A protein has these predicted regions:
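Short helix-loop-helix/strand-helix junction enriched in hydrophobic and basic residues
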Residues: 114-121
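Short, well-ordered beta-strand segments
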Residues: 133-135
Length: 195
C-alpha cells in the first residue's frame, strides 16, 4: 500500500480569482507565446498549486491549449476563444482610460472633436509587440498626421508599449481609414459618421 500523500494547502476562492485574472491577463499580453506551468506561476506571481488549478479550468474552458512533454506542460492560448473579445476588449479599454492617454491627448492636441481607440488594441487582437492606435479628429483642414504620443512603461505584463496618434480632419482622410476609425471605440467627444 502506498503511503498517504501529505495534504496540500487549501487555495481560497479570492486567491483563485486573482490567479484566474492574472492568468488571463498574461495570455492577453502574450497570446502567441508558449510557456510552462512553473514559468507561468512565476510570471504572474502566484503559487504553482493555484496556477495549476486555474490552468486546468482554462483548459476545460478551451481558452488554453496544453502540450505534455514528458512531465512538463507547455501552455498556449486559443486566440479564437470568446474571452479575447468578451473579456480582453473591456480589459484593454480599462487600461487605456487608466493610462492617462486621454489627458495626454488633450495636452498635445488643442480642441479635439473626438478621441477614438482603433486598430488591434480595440479588437483584442493585439500581440506582445503591438502599439496602441488613437485617432484624434480635429477641425483643421490638414492631411493625416501620425505622431508618437509616448510610451507606456508598464501595461499589465507588457512593457514599453508605444502609443501613436492619428490626427485627422474629416475632409482630408481616406475613406477606408475613416471606416476603420469609425468602427473603433469613442473614448471622448463625438464622432459623426455620415452615410
Amino acid at each position: 500500500m502506498k503511503p498517504a500523500k501529505t495534504p496540500l494547502k487549501n487555495v481560497t476562492i479570492p486567491k483563485l480569482e486573482r490567479t484566474f485574472n492574472k492568468c488571463l491577463v498574461w495570455f492577453y499580453a502574450f497570446p502567441t507565446t508558449k510557456i510552462g506551468l512553473t514559468d507561468l506561476a512565476v510570471s504572474i506571481n502566484s503559487s504553482k498549486t493555484a496556477t495549476k488549478e486555474v490552468v486546468e479550468s482554462l483548459i476545460q474552458e478551451q481558452f488554453l491549449n496544453r502540450e505534455i512533454i514528458g512531465k512538463a506542460w507547455l501552455l498556449s492560448s486559443n486566440q479564437k476563444h470568446s474571452f479575447f473579445s468578451t473579456k480582453k476588449i473591456p480589459y484593454n479599454l480599462q487600461n487605456v482610460y487608466e493610462s492617462g492617454i486621454i489627458e495626454a491627448v488633450y495636452k498635445n492636441t488643442p480642441s479635439p472633436r473626438a478621441i477614438i481607440l482603433f486598430g488591434s488594441y480595440r479588437w483584442g487582437t493585439d500581440l506582445a509587440e503591438s502599439d496602441i492606435d488613437i485617432a484624434v479628429e480635429v477641425i483643421d483642414n490638414h492631411d493625416l498626421q501620425i505622431v508618437p504620443l509616448g510610451v507606456i512603461q508598464r501595461l499589465g505584463y507588457r512593457k514599453n508599449v508605444p502609443v501613436n496618434l492619428h490626427i485627422f480632419s474629416r475632409n482630408k482622410i481616406e475613406k477606408n481609414l475613416f471606416v476603420n476609425i469609425a468602427n473603433g471605440i469613442v473614448l471622448d467627444g463625438f464622432l459623426e459618421v455620415r452615410v
